[in-house]
Amino acid sequence: MNLRVGFELVFACSQPTPMLLMLHTHAAHANEVLVPDRLLVGPPLPLTHYHDAFGNYCSRLITPPCGFLTLSSTAVLAVAGDPEVPSLDSYQSPVEDLPDECLQFLLGSRYCETDLLSNVAWQMFGNTPLGRPRVQAICDYVHRHVVFDYQQARPTRTAFETFREGVGVCRDYAHLAVALCRAMNIPARYCSGYISDVGLPPPYAPMDFCAWFEAWLGGRWQAFDPRNNAPRTGRVLMARGRDAADVALSNAFGPTPLAKFTVVCEPDEEPESLAVRAVASMQG
């Protein structure tokens, strides 16, 4: 299936303000790209790029002194047209056998307070089977316990606060599940990106960026989604990190309120028409 992903973000500017951006599809999808994303900036501004400590592709710019800054992008990827299939490699590695790069994802972080949730985690999940069944039990619990409510979203809510309040949005589901996994000695990292509604019945909510997490099982990272808690078709990663603080779509070092926000993640046309768009993208 060809999947088109993209966005348009408009920020109101009142002074030149440095910004850091994580708005590209992740390199993990390199073999699926039909039309690569390209970050368009209006008005045109100098733009530089770098990779952060987690391997995410990031951009830097300074906003105009006044008016509006528009950031947009679109990409087309060839993704599996069927719902995700859970991996059969689901064993849980003892801490002493984990790769060095996994160890940081066992520790508490800004939004994932493992110290406050450790006793709770062991009380609830200490008797569950190791590996995928334990992670799935955590996802099942988070999915039942947290009520999704955009109206009660706040950017400072932590995993422990989500546990106490029982309400949140997709990032809160992911933070709580990540913290509980880490408390059970399962490395877990936070992910952000796109998830399509392909295969779901209408009505559809307005498209938004999404959050899920990956757990280290079977000797590799595997995706879990406590918000939806069901296989989905068309999941596209943008960034990974310890929690949402590491993968913010934009970090502005000054006042830049968001004036417009649209996200697209939907099936696209057949490959022959993509060639025309690819040429146009390179020429533009």
Language model regions located:
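Short intrinsically disordered coil segments
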Residues: H24-H26, S87-E96, R227-P231, F253-P255
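Short, surface-exposed linear segments at secondary-structure transitions and domain or protein termini
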Residues: P44-T48, V95-L98, P231-R240
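A broadly conserved detector of short glycine/acidic/proline-rich loop/turn motifs that flank catalytic sites
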Residues: Q15, T25, L45, A75, ...
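Secondary-structure boundary elements
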Residues: C13, L77-G81, S87, D97-G168, ...
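Generic structural "secondary-structure junction" signal
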Residues: L21, V41-P43, T63-P64, V79, ...
